[in-house]
Amino acid sequence: MKVVTAIDSFKGSMTSMEAGFAAAEGIHRVDANAEVQVRPLADGGEGTVEALVAGMNGKTEHVKVTGPLGEPVICEYGIIESTKTAVIEMAGAAGITQVPDEKRNPLYTTTYGVGEVIKDAIEKGCRRFIVGIGGSATNDGGVGMLQALGYAFLDKDGKQVLPGARGLKDIAEITDAYVIPELAECKFRVACDVTNPLCGELGCSAIYGPQKGATPEMIKDMDQWLGAYAELAKGRFPKADPKYPGTGAAGGMGFAFLTFTDAVLESGINIVLDETKLEDYIKDADLVITGEGRMDGQTAMGKAPVGVAKLAKKHGKKVIAFAGAVQRDARACNDAGIDAFFPNLRGVVTLEEAMKNENAKQNMADTVEQVIRLMK
């Protein structure tokens, strides 16, 4: 029997590869000769660096950068040496979880550290980038990131504007005269699963501003400032299009990448499936195993396990999913390519017990074993 596992991380419990190897253990208890290919899975958000580094023989780098509030933070990112590709999660340098509730204010939070991570990767020889832009604490239109890469956003006196969304209102000139030259050699695949434009009722300020600490007055101001910034950019940079789907992602980071770098915005799961060449492994498999920490109706809306299932169904493969918890509305996943799904929990336990790494791996192996017994 040939089996491919591609399981998303169980957040706070198991990494993608740990879940896959636990499933492989369960399979081998039943069929010691089974050929099991354990592949990484992520959706472009949390866990993407970890999954791609572990699954693609990459290495982890740590760099001290400017955090969202201007304080130094250590950001972890990955490098896949074979393709000189850097894998970066924006949340590691400008994440909402790095800002305490009482300090959340997008007027002050900056993406400067994201640019510093990119610059560090460039200095280490990377020219391809996979960047996940979820979980941000910012609404600065990506200006901070671009400043770190050498773009200058100047006020009427010729000085760099202040960090955070508050600086947007003072931008009078944008120049690329000091951009690091290697940036022109770089290509970015930006994991973006939202379609919001930069401004307006569906723009980043209105939709995501409140969770970042914005008041109604701030939202109105930031939306106007981002609009003016976009208009200024359009006069100097022909790719600027604030209405393009996804430009409002991560407080305008989508707009920054599309306008000022050689970037494409793509579904996170599609990037991961492509980069890991999962389809090549699925073609020869008898069975595909996927899953995530919690399966529900949202899973069927295009989350990582369904991305795997769609790829598997393209080749007529059977797909089974395993999850830490399964909600009743998860049956929608059956219509999205997952033939059957199973919860891993063995009984009534506390959440803390269920999420312990050793328990989670054991539960995965035990449940997979029993399902495989039915198929042998």
Residue ranges and their predicted role:
Residues 1-133, 137-376:
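N-terminal loops that bind phosphate or other acidic moieties
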